[in-house]
């Protein structure tokens, strides 16, 4: 199940959470407990408050990280001892899977924005993993990847390499950061290919290293040939 950020902080800018929103999920958790169902809760499932999207440009703005941390802290503290299993972002790699799906004249700008917002989400994930463990050491916090298996169309080395590079970008780029705590070496090739310049500071790298997830989860839809 997922919790909707805007139910808890309607604009994202409020200092105090919406109590009615918190109670809405309390009712769900009480019902789950009645039937001995252990919830696995996704903190972000695409429901960034509209105000943040309109006024801050959403995850393209680093300020969104702090607002998300406020929201996540509220959940960890409110449902401590009730929820033990969390996912930071649902299908965090979707932004890469859909990159340039519909070619436009601004493809380079789309790539820069996509990799920038992903960097901010990966930082936010790492920060709230650390936060969740500090609030309740019993918390298990994982990542969630949209995974689609692919195979090279032939044994031609060009097809094999194309398949490998597709997997690296769409399937492994995000999960390598979340599981291993650092951008993989092949990320430099991907950034160069798309003309992307990321502002990755030494502090960012330390945050990613310290905030690795406890487990890996994925959704699976289909298999493809490359």
Regions from the PLM with identified roles:
Residues 5:
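N-terminal cofactor/phosphate-binding cores enriched in small/glycine residues
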Residues 11-13, 23-226:
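Active-site region of glycoside hydrolase catalytic domains
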């Amino acid at each position: 199940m997922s919790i909707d950020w805007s139910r808890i902080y309607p604009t994202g800018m409020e200092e105090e959470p919406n109590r009615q929103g918190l109670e809405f999920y309390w009712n769900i958790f009480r019902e789950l407990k009645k039937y001995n169902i252990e919830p696995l809760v996704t903190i972000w499932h695409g429901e960034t408050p509209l105000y943040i999207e309109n006024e801050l440009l959403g995850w393209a703005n680093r300020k969104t990280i702090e607002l998300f941390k406020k929201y996540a802290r509220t959940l960890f503290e409110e449902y401590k001892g009730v929820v033990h299993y969390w996912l930071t972002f649902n299908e965090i790699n979707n932004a890469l899977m859909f990159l340039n799906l519909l070619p436009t004249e601004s493809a380079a700008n789309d790539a820069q924005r996509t990799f920038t917002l992903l960097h901010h989400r990966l930082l936010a994930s790492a920060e709230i993993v650390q936060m969740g463990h500090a609030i309740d050491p019993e918390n298990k916090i994982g990542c969630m990847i949209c995974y689609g298996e692919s195979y090279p169309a032939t044994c031609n080395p060009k097809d094999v390499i194309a398949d490998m590079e597709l997997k690296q970008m769409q399937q492994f780029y995000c999960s390598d950061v979340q599981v291993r705590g650092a951008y993989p070496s092949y990320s430099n090739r991907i950034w160069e290919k798309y003309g992307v310049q990321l502002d990755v500071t030494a502090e960012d790298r330390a945050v990613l290293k310290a905030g690795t997830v406890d487990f890996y989860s994925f959704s699976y839809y289909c298999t493809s040939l490359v």
